[in-house]
Amino acid sequence: MALLIITTILWAFSFSLFGEYLAGHVDSYFAVLIRVGLAALVFLPFLRTRGHNLKTISLYMLVGAMQLGIMYMLSFHAYLYLTVSELLLFTVLTPLYITLIYDVMSQRRLRWGYAFSALLAVIGAGIIRYDRVTDHFWVGLLLVQLSNISFAIGMVGYKRLMETRPMPQHNAFAWFYLGAFLVAAVAWSLLGNAQKLPETTLQWSILVFLGVVASGIGYFMWNYGATQVDAGTLGIMNNMHVPAGLLVNLAIWHQQPHWPSFITGAAVILASLWVHRKWVAPRSAQTADDRRRDPASSE
C-alpha cells in the first residue's frame, strides 16, 4: 500500500509537467519513445532469459506494451484536446475497468462489492471536476477511455502473470519495458513528426525525469505494490491521482479548483477505500473460504 501512495504522489507531478511543457510542443510519439526507452534502459541490466520460456517472456512484453506503450500514445495525444484537469477527470472510470478485467482474466463472476467500492471512487473523482469541459469533450473522452482500458488490461495482466507465471519483479520489468519500447519505436517510425522534437534543455530534462523516475522507477513501484493488494484496493488507489494531480496543479501552476467539490470528492474517494478495506474485501475473502470448504465437507 505504501508503494502505491508514494507512486501516486510522484505521478501527480507527471500530468502537469507533460501538459504544461510538452503537449503541443513535442511530438507525442517521440515523447512516448523517449519515456519508455529511458525506462527500459534502467532495467536493461536485469534482462534474463534463463529459466523462462518464450510464452512467459512474450506475455510480460505484451502487458508492458498495453500498460505503457499504447496507453501513453493514447493519453499523450489526448493532451491536444484536453486540459490537465479534464484529462485527470476522464481517468476516473479506470477502477471499474480494473475490477471488471481482473474478474474476466480470473474467470470469476463479477463481484458486485468490488464494483460498488470502485464506483464510489468514480463518483468521488467526478465530483472534483464536474463543472466545465471544452469543445473537444468527446474526442478527448474517447482517447482517455481507450487509454484507461489499455492501462487496466496491462496492470491486471501483470498482476495475473505474477500469480500464474511468476518471475523476479526486476526481471519481469526488464521485459515489460522492452515490450513498451518496441511498440513505441514502431509507432514513432510510422507516425512520428521529426519536426517537433524537444528544443530546450527544460523539455529534455522533463522527458528524462518522466522516463527514468516517473516511468522507470514509478511503474516498478506501482506494479510491485499492485501484487500486494487486492483488485478493489488497486482500482481505488488508481483514482487518488485525481486530487493529487489537481493539488500539484494548484500549488505550482496556481490552477484554482472549486474547493467545496474538491474536498467533497477527495473525501468520497478516501471513504471508498475505507469501505472496501473494512467491509468489501473481508466479505469477499470469507465467501472464497466458504466455497473452498464446501467441496471438502461434501466429501
UniProtKB/Swiss-Prot annotation:
GO terms for cellular component: membrane; plasma membrane. It catalyses: biotin(in) = biotin(out). Keywords: Cell inner membrane, Cell membrane, Membrane, Repeat, Transmembrane, Transmembrane helix, Transport. Its main location: membrane. InterPro entries: CO/AA/NH_transpt (IPR004779), Diverse_Substrate_Transporter (IPR051258), EamA_dom (IPR000620). Residues 3-128, 139-274 form the EamA domain. The keyword Glycoprotein does not apply. Signal peptide: none annotated. It is found in: Cell inner membrane. The chain crosses the membrane at residues 2-22, 26-46, 56-76, 81-101, 110-130, 137-157, 172-192, 202-222, 233-253, 256-276. It is a multi-pass membrane protein. Uptake of biotin. NCBIfam families: 2A78. Belongs to the drug/metabolite transporter (DMT) superfamily. 10 TMS drug/metabolite exporter (DME) (TC 2.A.7.3) family. This is Biotin transporter. It comes from Salmonella typhimurium (strain LT2 / SGSC1412 / ATCC 700720). The gene is bioP.
